[in-house]
């Protein structure tokens, strides 16, 4: 939202508020897809869940999410900066700025924060059944067939995944021998 939603007018700012209000529905959709994938055996590795949790916590840290915080969250600082710029450009007055700030705060607290809280809860729960060691696509349901499809559609080789794996094993052996010589 910060890097991709340009704000040059009041309409742009109200569109930002609309996007913030839609975050919860989109995150809920993403969680549903992740749960369905998990039921099919497609799971995210443990280390990735740690990143999801850590980044989500950081996104909803600071004002307006933490009432006692002395610092603004990155998104809240951005919103306040954009409102100040709209005022400086005489596109809004102080009353309009306060009203837009109030609407943005409500969207962040009532939609955005619960969306990230849901992501944190899902990732914390899913983490308990995530593999500690990342597994390749071949370990996923239909993964070997998918990998073969990728080889055929994304490369110019006629080699199979097994052929490429065998070449890799031979190269590792050759390089080890060369390094130890």
Tell me what each language-model feature is.
Residues 1-181:
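N-terminal maturation segment of proteins
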